[in-house]
Amino acid sequence: MGLAIGWTPGLTALANAQTADGAAATPRIIAAAANPHSVAPARSEPVTDPVADPRAVVTFGKARFTVLAPELIRMEWAADSKFEDHASFVFLNRRLPVPPFEHEVADAGQKLIIKTSALALTYTPGADGRFGPDNLAIEFAVNGKRVDWHPGLVDPENLQGTTRTLDGALGDRTKEPIEPGLVSRSGWAVVDDSTRPLFDSADFRFLHGEKSPWPWVMERPAGERQDWYFFGYGHDYYKALGDYVRVAGRIPLPPRFAFGAWWSRYWAYSDQEIEEIIRGFHENDIPLDVFVIDMDWHPTFSGERGKLDASGHSKGWTGYSWNRLLFPDPDQFLVTLHADGLKTSLNLHPASGIQPWEDRYPEMAKAMGVDPATKQYIPFDITDKRFARNYLDIVHHPLEKQGIDFWWLDWQQEPKTKLPGVTPTWWLNYVHFTDQQREGKRPLLFHRWGGLGNHRYQIGFSGDTVSVWDSLAFQPWFTATAANVGYAYWSHDIGGHAPGAVEPELYTRWVQFGAFSPILRTHTTKNPDSERRIWAYPEPYSSILRSTFQLRYALQPYIYTEARRTYDTGVAFFRPLYYDWPQEDAAYTTKGEYMFGDQMLAAPVTRPVDKATGLATEKVWLPAGEWIEWPTGKHLIGPATVERSFSIEQTPVYLRAGAIVPMQPPMRYTGEKPVDPLIVNVWPLAPGQTSNYEVYEDSGASVEYQRGVFARTPIKATQAGDLLRVEIGPAQGSYPGMLNTRSYQLRLPADWPPVTVTVNGVPVAHAGVTGKGGWSFEGNTLTTVISVARGSVGDRITVEVRRAAGRAARRNELDGFAGAMTRLRGAYDALRQTFPVSDAPDILVDAMQAGDRLGYHPEQAQEEIVRFHKVLSQAQAAAAEIDKDLAQRAKETDTDAQKQHRLDAAARAHRQVNEACQESQSPLASP
């Protein structure tokens, strides 16, 4: 079975592809590549200076205004006229290039006016100067219309941000409110930073070793103060988030392995059971990168259920010592997992502190000034720097040295700490994430959203949702909306958390969504009926699940490139449609769709199929332009809302015309082997169109990506008449472990086969179905596959593909061909269920085999396509006749059960053939 998108560039032929020797190139620092939305400096590590350039500051009485950008102004008022220059939990860096602005004092010194290119601020202090609706106003424009803001103005059009957890959420019914976002259809947002805690230092240049600085929390000075940030970006949401990460810190790039598959389940696994599950992944050809071990890795005292520990929490809820019954030799167990290429994460509930039964208790007690003989527990106090250092150095670091790669901070019960405004969730995220930076690692933390500023410490654990269709339907909107606060990496329990068994169809659709989400992590509660092992599901679901996991891995070069773009721009690659189409009402009201990087629009199926047809029907809104539906190859023209039907193996993903999508060969885990060949998919371009893309690569594990140690490979595709030219490279930049040489596979889906192919001017011959040493044609998806021999990554490769005269203008004849093939195979399978009363008619088999014939003889493509449309019409009539005939026979001979089965099969086949006919009807104008 093909990959579960419905059809996709084939990868199985590359499973044993020869790889380069992986010789490392010498790193050199390079400038960041041009990006229309990039805010990244050309070459630098992250800079934080909370003290603004004095030229950006205007002080007027008890108020101070800092112009951070034309659309972004900080507004402070202090009763004692003492203003704050420390970094806050949200805003770290205020020393930005000073934008042009004017300011004047008017009305005999009673009024301050500040004007930038985007807004005008007026402040008339009055008696005490405290900001209010009567003395402060900002005027700006949204789509040419004047907008006036003043304190206290309610914004009903804020586009929202995210929330701490989806625990217990049933669909969109969340237990905790979703916080406001930084963008709004009203064109403005205000962040009140008045009471947020501060950092005692702005030295976030984390070094490897004990001398590394570690800024710590401090309270705000006493007194009456206001500290606001006004965002007046109109509908330029890209710029709003871009400037936000300039002042609040960038969204970090996770390690590359994080974009692989994660296994997680709340279950008391032994080491043997875990190894058995890993074997199951390998034996069933399912890739895996991360094994998350839930809380039973440590003693949970299940025999003392209901008993509380000294902190008042359930005994065993927190733990830092291995359960030696389940894990007799943790060191060897972790060696085994790492030998399989896996990363390991352990579950923590830190709230209970360090209890006297923990292995590290004696050392921890001494470090905290407690006599271990007293067995007095060590309370959890993460805002105490002494406790935090000991908590990490004594308790966590030894486990990390054993082989634990990152932590899952599952839950933190208390909503507050000893310090006002400091929540345990927010501060734990900071402490654990920056501890990894101090250790010299590229950090990864799995925890919940703690509030604004937590975009710097990801990945997010969304919590325990209910396993129903409504929960799945809510998650695309929820995940995309988090982009509005820079939270780019939510990880959901794929399949839901509770209460128990999940029907195969729902699990399959959830995994399909997961493949096109930031993190693909399956999970469930401690219930024997809750199954997440792919191979335990019946067919066809098991095969579809497998191919969906494989597709996720195939897309890793694309996903990783888009994650780098997230770091550069501050805009999540999984984002709402209104970032790219802010003037379209449908971009705001369409909640089941999102952009998945710059090249793809995803609209995952979140409802069950119709039992009679085997298809799920969805309404999909497509923005302006030409879009290609990946599962079917159908071209659709936007803006439009279209009604589309999808079988269980199809995931609705739409690509821009001319989209360039890099992919990789099959791998058991990330980094199992070099990405060689790099697979380059170029989707059909419009006449005269040029497309560009840059594939981003780095070591995948170090923080040097922040300092210019990476490489980008440019790809350019141009359609000129019937000639397609694709240029790859040369690679720009380098990093440790970078390939010096590489091969490529160029794939051209949904288009006519070539007449001639050249690589760097040298003709390449058609090499039959194998494609070895030349090019081949995959007829069922109309994909030309061109193998490009290994060469230096520093060279430019030019591939020219010429099709028969006039073919580019007749592309509409191919429209939806891949989808028609899928529907015909479905009809064939359905009719075979009616045997021996009936069977698939020859004319249907003839139509279904058109793709195979094209693959064998691409030179006959024109004749075959013309014939296909004629045969398809005949197959439609034949299917209708069989449907009618079986209905009559069922009345005469069958039992009720037999009758219903055959009637359903015939009706399904009839519908599938009708759908095949619809798929092959092009919305593109005929020449």
Regions found by a protein language model. Give the residues of each.
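Bacterial N-terminal signal peptides
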Residues: 1-10
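Sec/Tat signal peptide C-region and signal peptidase I cleavage site
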Residues: 11-16
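Mature N-terminal, pre-catalytic/accessory segment of carbohydrate-active enzymes
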Residues: 17, 21-83, 103-123, 128, ...
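N-terminal accessory segment at the very beginning of proteins
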Residues: 18-247, 256, 273, 278-279, ...
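Catalytic-domain carbohydrate-binding cleft regions of carbohydrate-active enzymes
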Residues: 27-44, 49, 121, 133-656, ...
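Solvent-exposed beta-strand/loop surfaces of large extracellular or lumenal domains
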Residues: 87-102, 370, 628-648, 756-786
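A surface-exposed beta-strand-loop module
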Residues: 110-113, 117-120, 770-798, 806
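Accessory, solvent-exposed terminal regions and/or long lumenal/extracellular loops of proteins
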Residues: 655-763, 780-781, 788-904, 911
